[in-house]
Curated annotation (Swiss-Prot):
Heme 1 (or BL or b562) is low-potential and absorbs at about 562 nm, and heme 2 (or BH or b566) is high-potential and absorbs at about 566 nm. Belongs to the cytochrome b family. A ubiquinone binds at residue 201. Keywords: Electron transport, Heme, Iron, Membrane, Metal-binding, Mitochondrion, Mitochondrion inner membrane, Respiratory chain, Transmembrane, Transmembrane helix, Transport, Ubiquinone. It comes from the Eukaryota. The cytochrome bc1 complex contains 11 subunits: 3 respiratory subunits (MT-CYB, CYC1 and UQCRFS1), 2 core proteins (UQCRC1 and UQCRC2) and 6 low-molecular weight proteins (UQCRH/QCR6, UQCRB/QCR7, UQCRQ/QCR8, UQCR10/QCR9, UQCR11/QCR10 and a cleavage product of UQCRFS1). This cytochrome bc1 complex then forms a dimer. Heme b b566 binds at residues 97, 196. This is Cytochrome b. It is a multi-pass membrane protein. The chain crosses the membrane at residues 33-53, 77-98, 113-133, 178-198, 226-246, 288-308, 320-340, 347-367. Binds 2 heme b groups non-covalently.
Length: 379
């Protein structure tokens, strides 16, 4: 008799995706982040669900409802901090996952890559709207600043901003709709993640060497299930340490001050995971130019397959490209640091140089380095 997991209509899908899936035998720990992202998403949906049971999306009670969750609800504080720091872990895994895709040339699976970019934008939108919900100072002013960027769109900009606000400023209508969207979007992310996997399983996984691994595949279970469990345990360990020992480490103290439209905080800045994009936005003195640079800083990923000039897929055997990749990582860390600094003399210049370098590496230096490496191979 055939095993039920191979015949049952539902079990068959799970079996072909997570149990008997033929997987390259040489994929490294960098391939763990997909499953870690899945764990983060489930964690966020579950903690978010329990938070939504006690949260009220009204400007007069939103802040106090979050305080109530932390003080009066059984284990409410841990649910709230798991959700807040879970978002940080989510973005760490996301950036590692995208970085691995860039390093090993996974963007040549164009469908999977493009769905991934849509996923990235959706998760960013979800996180932004979630940050508005506690209705602290940084929530309110962050929402005001970021939604205001849309007013840079010619002709329809101002109308669009007021349409999103549901009035002439960020107010009750804005908070209510942001809560509605913040609740629904994770399920959209979940659906997109399934499509992402669907496209990935059409081609099979990439591997560090970048060459086809059809001749050397092993079943996903038990080899990679056990490897993923190790990654998951490390993720849970870091998250637990963060939540139990310094839950506010990555947050902004200004968000413990209730939103006040009459008092602007000295430094308006988003959560740490958006600082690199915020630095790129601020580095351009023109409003529309800044908004375009902000969008392009992520959208540039979509043209990576077109910029791939190398004869090899990954960077495993390409030292010049490797140096440029790590320069890009250092540049992004610099941008993240600059995004959190005030708009003053040395920071402005550093931010502008780092922004130029970011686009230079991706658009100019990496394709040229690949061509040079191709020529070196001929010798």
């Amino acid at each position: 008799m055939t095993n039920i997991r191979k015949t049952h209509p539902l079990m068959k899908i799970i079996n072909n995706s997570f149990i008997d899936l033929p997987t390259p035998s040489n994929i490294s720990a960098w391939w763990n982040f997909g499953s870690l992202l899945g764990i983060c998403l489930i964690l966020q949906i579950l903690t978010g669900l329990f938070l939504a049971m006690h949260y009220t999306s009204d400007t007069t009670t939103a802040f106090s409802s979050v305080t109530h969750i932390c003080r009066d609800v059984n284990y409410g504080w841990i649910i709230r901090y798991l959700h807040a720091n879970g978002a940080s872990m989510f973005f760490i895994c996301l950036y590692m996952h995208v970085g691995r895709g860039l390093y090993y040339g996974s963007y040549t699976f164009t469908e999977t890559w493009n769905i991934g970019i849509i996923l990235l934008f959706t998760v960013m939108a979800t996180a932004f709207m979630g940050y508005v919900l506690p209705w602290g100072q940084m929530s309110f002013w962050g929402a005001t600043v970021i939604t205001n960027l849309l007013s840079a769109i010619p002709y329809v900009g101002t109308d669009l901003v007021q349409w999103i606000w549901g009035g002439f400023s960020v107010d009750k209508a804005t908070l209510t709709r942001f809560f509605a969207f913040h609740f629904i979007l994770p399920f959209v992310v979940l659906a997109l993640a399934v499509v992402h996997l669907l496209f990935l399983h059409e081609t099979g996984s990439n591997n560090p060497s970048g060459i086809t691994s059809d001749s050397d595949k092993i079943p996903f279970h038990p080899y990679y299930t056990i490897k993923d469990i190790l990654g998951a345990l490390l993720l849970i360990l870091v998250l637990t340490l963060l939540v139990l020992f310094s839950p506010d480490l990555l947050g902004d103290p200004d968000n413990y001050i209730p939103a006040n439209p009459l008092s602007t905080p000295p430094h308006i800045k988003p959560e740490w995971y958006f600082l690199f994009a915020y630095a790129i936005l601020r580095s351009i003195p023109n409003k529309l130019g800044g908004v375009l640079a902000l969008v392009l800083s992520i959208l540039i990923l979509a043209i990576m397959p077109l910029l791939h000039t190398s004869k090899q897929r990954g960077m495993m055997f390409r030292p010049i490209s490797q140096c440029l990749f790590w320069l890009l990582v250092a540049d992004l860390l610099t941008l993240t640091w600059i995004g959190g600094q005030p708009v003053e003399h040395p920071y402005i210049t550093i931010g502008q140089l780092a922004s130029i370098l970011y686009f230079m590496i991706l658009l100019v230096l990496m394709p040229i380095a690949s061509i040079i490496e191709n020529n070196i191979l001929k010798w």
